[in-house]
């Protein structure tokens, strides 16, 4: 899988751009605020139909324009496929092979992308919602129906929280509607949790040996899922649903008192351990970086296992931040298999042999040469 070419219209600081890429390594060089990260972001949006940098889609549109458009042509399973994302103040539309997709969840997965940027260290050391979002985005790539159930879950969760706020103000009100919304919430929560458990087992399978290799066999990585209910990871959705039913019955009064939902996938977390110690709390910066890198490299192999083709890798201002050993391990892992985009302010710190193999692009004020 690789991107043959990309066209941008009214996107961020790009008025109009058409660019063809090498199917192996592409290095994008530019000073800060010139547009190199915007170019990487556009590839990400082409995959996920959303930005990793902002939830406000109007920021993707040039300030004096009323729309932005990202068009890409990808090679997937030996076929050349055109993709398009159009963004307006009213929302987004996605096309595959010139056919508009009725739901964005039908589009996600059309092209698979793994991004590694400095902020990805927050997967290890940041807040729980960052790790939940990581799981949701990666699962959505390999299981498009996951996105549907996630959207339905979030919709019902919002309705349920609104009702709990009302019941908080009027605690003696009828709770029949709460039971209806609880059943709907459990239906989607059970599917999400079951699929997260399956995904986590695959992530462990790939991340643990990668981490051992990067750490020169000195460290053992463990990944633990921390749910809001007591449930084993081998439980199916029916068993998970039954446990949720008992949990919500148990916390019903407390939820009404607090006016919010106290259980569900939206309250879960991932915990990373290295040699038995929580990396978030006790890990060195080097261990945190190794853990983040191991997870990203594991994603590449996991997508290949599930989809049958390697994803596209985006290394946004991160390669020069890795020491020589970690950089070598990363490049040796992906060499010849993965189309890679590297953005950097300077080629210093990037392996000479990598630059020799790469197509170089220089970005200045939204113009690529």
Swiss-Prot record:
CDD domains: ABC_RecF
GO molecular function, one term: ATP binding
InterPro entries: DNA-binding_RecF, DNA-binding_RecF_CS, P-loop_NTPase, RecF/RecN/SMC_N, RecF_2
Pfam families on file: SMC_N (PF02463)
Main location (coarse class): cytoplasm
Keyword set, alphabetical order: ATP-binding, Cytoplasm, DNA damage, DNA repair, DNA replication, DNA-binding, Nucleotide-binding, SOS response
Superkingdom per UniProt: Bacteria
GO CC, any one term: cytoplasm
Family affiliation: Belongs to the RecF family.
HAMAP family associated with the record: RecF (MF_00365)
Protein's name according to its UniProt entry: DNA replication and repair protein RecF
Biological classification of the source: Bacteria, Bacillati, Bacillota, Bacilli, Bacillales
């Amino acid at each position: 899988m690789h991107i043959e070419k990309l066209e941008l219209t009214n996107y961020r600081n790009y008025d109009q751009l058409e660019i063809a890429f090498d199917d192996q390594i592409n290095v994008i060089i530019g000073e800060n605020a010139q547009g190199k990260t915007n170019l990487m972001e556009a590839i990400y949006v082409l995959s996920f139909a959303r930005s990793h940098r902002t939830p406000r889609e109007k920021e993707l549109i040039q300030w004096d324009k009323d729309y932005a458009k990202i068009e890409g042509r990808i090679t997937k399973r030996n076929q050349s496929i055109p993709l398009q994302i159009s963004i307006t103040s009213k929302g987004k539309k996605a096309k595959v092979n010139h056919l508009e997709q009725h739901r964005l969840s039908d589009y996600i997965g059309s092209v698979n992308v793994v991004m590694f940027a400095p902020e990805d260290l927050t997967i290890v050391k940041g807040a729980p919602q960052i790790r939940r979002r990581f799981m949701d985005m990666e699962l959505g790539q390999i299981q498009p129906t996951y996105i549907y159930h996630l959207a339905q879950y979030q919709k019902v969760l919002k309705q349920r929280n609104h009702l709990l706020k009302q019941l908080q103000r009027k605690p003696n009100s009828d709770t029949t509607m709460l039971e209806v919304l609880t059943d709907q919430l459990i239906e989607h929560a059970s599917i999400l949790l079951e699929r997260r458990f399956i995904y986590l087992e695959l992530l462990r399978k790939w991340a643990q040996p990668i981490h051992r290799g990067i750490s020169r066999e000195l460290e053992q990585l463990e990944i633990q899922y921390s749910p809001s209910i007591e449930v084993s990871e081998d439980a199916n959705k029916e068993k998970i649903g039954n446990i949720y039913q008992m949990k919500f019955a148990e916390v019903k009064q407390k939820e009404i008192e607090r006016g919010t939902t106290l259980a569900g996938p939206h309250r879960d977390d991932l915990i990373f351990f290295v040699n038995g110690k929580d990396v978030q709390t006790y890990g060195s910066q080097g261990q945190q970086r190794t853990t983040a890198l191991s997870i990203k490299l594991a994603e590449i192999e996991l997508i290949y296992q599930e989809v049958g083709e390697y994803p596209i890798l985006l290394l946004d201002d991160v390669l020069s931040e890795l020491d020589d050993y970690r950089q070598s391990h990363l490049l040796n892992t992906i060499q010849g298999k993965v189309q890679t985009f590297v953005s950097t302010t300077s080629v210093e710190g990037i392996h000479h042999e990598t630059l020799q193999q790469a197509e170089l692009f220089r970005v200045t004020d939204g113009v690529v040469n």
